[in-house]
């Protein structure tokens, strides 16, 4: 059976056909509409899936935000242009006339990355550092989603009580500091208004402020990982996302994590499936996991 997998992120929408063998084909992308209106996202999703839906027997969605009863509830609306709520499953069933499931994107990616691990691993945490910071937790070989879909939203744990206000309403969240949006928001002077990609480029060219912003993000993530180790005693942490997979970033996180006491050290791995983990995880869950 072929799954039409969809990944909804703060920057882009992706879709692909994934067979029972896990092979990805006909992958497509569109920019995520920066709009508060549900119609904008519906129209973008329609354009994304219309060339693919005739070749699939079901739909699996991995989306940013809390997924509850098939709907997207934005924990940080800024990541979706201010959109607060969207009926994901209902919309895709109407667009495709196919059975549809939905799950948080980082939870889906965690499940895909867990399948790729070697050895006897039952406890792992996945962290995505991208437009926002999200996560997924596998414990006892099972993916944790929680009764309300909130499990794994580790980007909204406290990093700095005097830090910036996060889009979720809290102050000093990891996401407000370490994410691509957080990196860009802290830029000043000639870097003011630059996006995270530009800041990484400037850091590679030796720009001191850009380097400091990236170090601030990596240091914040390392402290989060130490907290995660203390909370879950996980065997490894897998890092993905456009920031998490940026050249040199994971090495910086490892450097800062090494400065923590030894009890909080844990193996860090780059995401095996890179930017396709959410698509694959959603398809895998559609094949047999009860959500």
Curated annotation (Swiss-Prot):
Positions of Zn(2+) binding: 156, 166, 168, 173
The keyword Hydrolase belongs to this UniProt entry's keyword annotation: no
The protein's Enzyme Commission number: 2.7.1.60
Pfam families the record matches: ROK
Catalytic activity: an N-acyl-D-mannosamine + ATP = an N-acyl-D-mannosamine 6-phosphate + ADP + H(+)
This protein's UniProt keywords: ATP-binding, Carbohydrate metabolism, Kinase, Metal-binding, Nucleotide-binding, Transferase, Zinc
Biological pathway: Amino-sugar metabolism; N-acetylneuraminate degradation; D-fructose 6-phosphate from N-acetylneuraminate: step 2/5
Name of the top EC class for this enzyme: transferase
Residues binding ATP: 5-12, 132-139
Any one GO BP annotation for this protein: N-acetylneuraminate catabolic process
Alphabetical list of SUPFAM superfamilies matching this protein: Actin-like ATPase domain
InterPro entries assigned to the protein according to its UniProt record, in alphabetical order: ATPase_NBD, ManNAc_kinase_bac, ROK, ROK_cs
MF annotations from Gene Ontology: ATP binding; N-acylmannosamine kinase activity; zinc ion binding
Gene3D superfamilies named among the record's database cross-references: 3.30.420.40
Coiled-coil ranges from the UniProt annotation: none
Assembly notes: Homodimer.
NCBIfam families named in the record: NactlManKinNanK, PRK05082.1
Stated family: Belongs to the ROK (NagC/XylR) family. NanK subfamily.
Known role: Catalyzes the phosphorylation of N-acetylmannosamine (ManNAc) to ManNAc-6-P.
The name this protein goes by in its record: N-acetylmannosamine kinase
Organism in which the protein naturally occurs: Escherichia coli O139:H28 (strain E24377A / ETEC)
Gene: nanK
């Amino acid at each position: 059976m072929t799954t039409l997998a969809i990944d909804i992120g703060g920057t882009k929408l992706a879709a692909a056909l994934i067979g029972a063998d896990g092979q990805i084909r006909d992958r497509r992308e569109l920019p995520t509409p920066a709009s508060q209106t549900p119609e904008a996202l519906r129209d973008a999703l329609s354009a994304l899936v219309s060339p693919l839906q005739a070749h699939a027997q079901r739909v699996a969605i991995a989306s940013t935000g809390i997924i509850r009863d098939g709907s997207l509830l934005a924990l940080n609306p800024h990541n979706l242009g201010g959109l607060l709520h969207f009926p994901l499953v209902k919309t895709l069933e109407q667009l495709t006339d196919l059975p549809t499931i939905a799950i948080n994107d980082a939870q889906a990616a965690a499940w895909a990355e867990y399948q790729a691990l070697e050895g006897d691993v039952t406890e792992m945490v996945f962290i995505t550092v991208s437009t926002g910071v999200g996560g997924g937790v596998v414990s006892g070989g099972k993916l944790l989603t929680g009764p309300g879909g909130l499990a794994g939203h580790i980007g909204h744990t406290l990093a700095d009580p005097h830090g910036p206000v996060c889009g979720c309403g809290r102050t000093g969240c990891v996401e407000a500091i370490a994410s691509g949006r957080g990196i860009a928001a802290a830029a000043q002077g000639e870097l003011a208004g630059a996006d995270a990609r530009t800041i990484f480029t400037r850091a590679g060219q030796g720009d001191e402020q850009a380097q400091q912003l990236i170090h601030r993000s990596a240091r914040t993530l390392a402290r989060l990982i130490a907290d995660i180790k203390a909370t879950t005693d996980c065997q490894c942490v897998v890092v993905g996302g456009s920031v998490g997979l940026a050249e040199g970033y994971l090495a910086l996180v490892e450097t800062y994590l090494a400065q923590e006491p030894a009890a909080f050290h844990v193996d860090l791995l780059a995401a095996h499936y890179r930017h396709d983990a959410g698509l694959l995880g959603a398809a895998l869950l559609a094949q047999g996991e009860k959500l």
